[in-house]
Structure formats: structure tokens, C-alpha cells
Amino acid sequence: YEIYNNSADILYLDGIYFANLTPGTATTKLPIWPEADGNNYAYGERVWKFPGNGTEYPLAPGESCIISQFAANHQLDIYNPQSPIDGSSSEFEFNMNNPNFPDQAAYDMQHVFYQGKAEMGSIPQYLTSVFGGAYVIFRVPEGEAWDPVNDENMKTTDLSKPNSNVYYAKIPIKYVLDAVEAVNNESKMNAKRVPGVLDAGITWVGATYCGLGIARKLSTDEEGNPIIRE
């Protein structure tokens, strides 16, 4: 994942959250959320946070940083020489403390939430969905508290599954800095699950395990400086 500073100011990554939203795969059969939530939340399956004390990880205007699932050179013989990915220059990674995917030199993202708990769970590696995932980055305003592990008001189950004990983090829309939604392919254009106020459209690469990704389109501002289009 590549995060850009699309502003004219130095921004700090410290304390910014990253979440993949549910459903992890695009579907027209959407979850049912509490009626009282209205349109005020996005719902996170797993949540991470950038480390730092507030000013440790600056991002200058026009700069970007990379967060890798596994910040190694995936083309090494011990992994997959046919892989298109060399993640060894990544600044951050989602380290799951799995000896099969040992901790790399990149800074570790801090794990915040999964299935209602702070623990990472038993899944061996954090993976990006190849079937069209949806993601947000967000920041909790100064003076506000957001704790989906210990605050019952900040997590919920999918009410279409009455006996479910799988919890999702309620992410206030007002906290969200940016969102991206992908689907499997163009046949899933009617399967949007991210609120339009966060991402009005959807996109896709059209195939699985094809070595392709998605990116914002480049443009320029009034002074001719390069910017990333929303």
C-alpha cells in the first residue's frame, strides 16, 4: 500500500489508522448494521496504526511511504523468484510475528483490532484480498477516544447473522482521511459497500494474481505542482 501526502504541508503518519473494511470481498449481500448507526460509520475487519509519538514519521508534500504485508524481497529463492514484488525498501510492514515470515527492517505497524480483540488471531499472515478489498485511513481527533476493543459502542456484529460472535470495528465517517474500494471485476459494479461520501466510485484490475494494482491518477494543481486526484 502506498500512502501519499497530497497536501502542501508536512504531515505526520504517527497515530494514523489503517483498516480493511468488511465485507472483504465485493458482494450484493451486504451485512446488516445497527439501525442507530445510520450512515455514520464504516466497519473494519482488522485495524492497524502507524507507530510514533506524534512527530517521528513526517511525510513531506508530494512524498509517499509504502506499507507491505511482508517487507522482504519476495523474489528471493526462499520465497518466489517469479514474484513481481520486492518489498525490501518498504518503510512499514504488517508484521504478524510468524517465524515463516520473519520481522523485516521496516517499522512495524501497531495492531489494534481483530474480531473484537487486540490480539492478532491465528491467521499466519495479513493478506490483501485478491477479490477486491476496501480500505480506509483515518485519524482520531485530538481530545476524542476511540477504543473498539474495550468500548462496546465502537464494535458490532453483522445483525444478519444473529448467533455470530465476530465483531467489527465501527469507524466514524468523520475520522476518515481517505478510502479506496475495489471489486473483482466490472460485473460487480452493483456490489458497492463503502459509503459514497468516502469513495464515490469503485475500481478493479479484472483478474486475480496478475501482478497488477490500482493507483490514483496524477494531475496538477493551479501552480503546476503534481497532485494525486481524488
Predicted regions and their residues:
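"Short basic amphipathic alpha-helical interaction patches in structured regions
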Residues: 2, 15-17, 81-84
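Short aromatic-acidic-glycine turn motif
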Residues: 19-35
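Short, hydrophobic/aromatic beta-strand segments
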Residues: 9-20, 78
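Eukaryotic short linear interaction motifs
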Residues: 10, 25-27, 74-75
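Predominantly extracellular/luminal cell-surface or secreted proteins
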Residues: 4, 19-21, 140, 217
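Asparagine-centered strand-capping/turn motif at beta-strand->loop junctions
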Residues: 1-8
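Surface loops and adjacent helix of pleckstrin homology
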Residues: 6, 16, 70
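Solvent-exposed beta-edge/loop recognition patches
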Residues: 38-229
